[in-house]
């Protein structure tokens, strides 16, 4: 059958404390921004991840089309991206004349895919999950599919500099996000065993 969900089991509260995550960040550089392990925001209820509105080749992300045809999830690489997503380019951003800061207005209830500024790595003895909603950050939700498996972005798998995909939806009213703004937080959890197969 078609696999659409992922299920994780935990014994009690398996989340690491901020102190434990700070120690791991110092030891393993769990998240890095341009090779720097300095965090973009304070470590509180997880490691902060910020949004990248600089983009690559003029593209900063994608916005889901409201209406599209049905898909067969088992037909991988069978559909055109343009059938389901609109590109968000630099031309769609608000760029400050004063300091060249970049901002994006999120339309109410629209669904966006953006990229984190930071690269993320998950050691093989850990898993990670994005904190899906934080009322201190704003009236939107990120993240809808926030599981990170052991080995994600791991240097030993030649996968370093792997960014996180940020799935974002604004609620009720338009919402402005700025380049480098903290969007969500990453919480690490220890595995009961090291998996035989890494991400």
Per-segment meaning from a language model:
Residues 1-199:
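DUTPase catalytic domain/fold
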